[in-house]
């Protein structure tokens, strides 16, 4: 089982590294392919939709047909996505590529979290440790992506970067085929029925999502908030990738400790969540009032600490909702609820935050 844990985490690291690298050059690469800004923008929104909103189906399919099968399908769709993406001279191929990117990432990510719960057994400490490791490797890969991309952009070899990402996904897919068959032994297949939604999505489940959606949604808006701060306000766009690197580095440093220490109950979120919300919003306006490169980075530190706390708190709370059967559905439903909240908050940020 230790081998399977490492395999899942290694696959998550390299696949996310490739995914973030691809996203970083997404706009530039497709512009050079001759696609219009509106076509690129819509395809990117389709990617995010497939990646988030379909998570609940990814979870249900994982519970019904097997976590391993859905993760392998996700790996295969990632490979297929790069084939379409490299051939994306036509808009239809681009839409196929982004759909495969979003759904592939969704299938693997949702069911990998559920699989780690199954591997961990019944011990809460082991479950939270593995969920913390999953978040940590995700942060490490997002931190490494900007560093990987810089030389490819500088020397105008973006096409080579996409081919490198494609090669990573092909190698990962081939390496995963045999080991993933062992995962089936740790899971009991469950056929989903809509009548069971009430048993799974309890009042406490909905309550913690309602309480934590503000800090989590604002944290997801990192790629809007900090480019605005460093580019529009300070006129220093070169600091945006540095901020992303610092954010990833701090996340990696904090993640293990937070995973061990944070053990909130649903009732405790009633007073912790408002503190997190105020803590991530109020310093933003103080930063704008006392604007400088130093206050910007101070806010980045505050932002990251609250982001990691909120993400870890939610991950550990989901572990408590684990009923031993509908693990895929639990993570899928959580991802869907947070994606809907994030859409609402992100549409308000330009009017309330970016002033």
What is each of the regions a protein language model found here?
Residues 325-354:
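A late C-terminal transmembrane helix in Major Facilitator Superfamily
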Residues 55-66, 153, 254-267:
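Helix-to-loop junctions at the C-terminal end of transmembrane segments
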Residues 1-49, 205-244:
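Helix-loop boundary and gating motifs at the non-cytosolic
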Residues 1-3, 180-211:
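Juxtamembrane intracellular "pre-TM" segments in multi-pass secondary transporters
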């Amino acid at each position: 089982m230790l081998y399977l844990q490492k395999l899942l985490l290694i696959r998550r690291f390299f696949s996310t590294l490739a995914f973030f690298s691809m996203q970083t050059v997404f706009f530039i690469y497709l512009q050079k392919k001759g696609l219009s800004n509106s076509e690129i923008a819509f395809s990117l929104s389709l990617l995010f939709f497939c990646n988030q909103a379909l998570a609940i189906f990814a979870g249900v399919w994982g519970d019904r047909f097997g976590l391993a099968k859905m993760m392998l399908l996700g790996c295969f769709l990632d490979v297929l996505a790069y084939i379409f993406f490299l051939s994306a001279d036509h808009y239809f191929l681009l839409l196929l590529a982004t759909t495969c990117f979003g759904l592939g990432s969704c299938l693997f990510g949702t069911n990998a979290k559920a699989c780690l719960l199954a591997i961990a057994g019944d011990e809460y400490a082991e479950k939270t440790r593995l969920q913390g490791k999953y978040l940590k490797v995700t942060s490490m890969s997002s931190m490494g992506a900007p560093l990987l991309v810089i030389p490819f952009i500088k020397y105008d070899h973006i096409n080579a970067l996409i081919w490198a990402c494609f090669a990573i996904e092909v190698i990962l897919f081939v390496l995963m085929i045999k080991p993933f068959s062992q995962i089936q032994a740790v899971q009991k297949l469950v056929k989903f029925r809509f009548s069971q939604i009430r048993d799974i999505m309890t009042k406490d489940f909905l309550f913690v999502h309602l309480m934590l959606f503000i800090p989590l949604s604002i944290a997801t808006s990192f790629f809007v908030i900090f480019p605005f701060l460093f580019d529009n306000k300070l006129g220093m766009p070169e600091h945006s990738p540095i901020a992303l690197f610092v954010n990833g580095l701090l996340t990696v440093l904090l993640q293990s400790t937070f995973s061990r220490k944070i053990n909130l109950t649903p009732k405790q979120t009633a007073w912790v969540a408002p503190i997190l919300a105020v803590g991530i919003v109020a310093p933003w306006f103080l930063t704008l009032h006392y604007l400088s490169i130093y206050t910007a980075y101070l806010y980045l530190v505050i932002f990251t600490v609250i982001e990691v706390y909120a993400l870890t708190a939610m991950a550990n709370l989901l572990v408590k909702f684990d009923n031993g059967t509908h693990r895929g559905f639990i993570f899928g439903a959580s991802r869907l609820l947070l994606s809907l909240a994030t859409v609402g908050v992100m549409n308000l940020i330009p009017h309330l935050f970016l002033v």
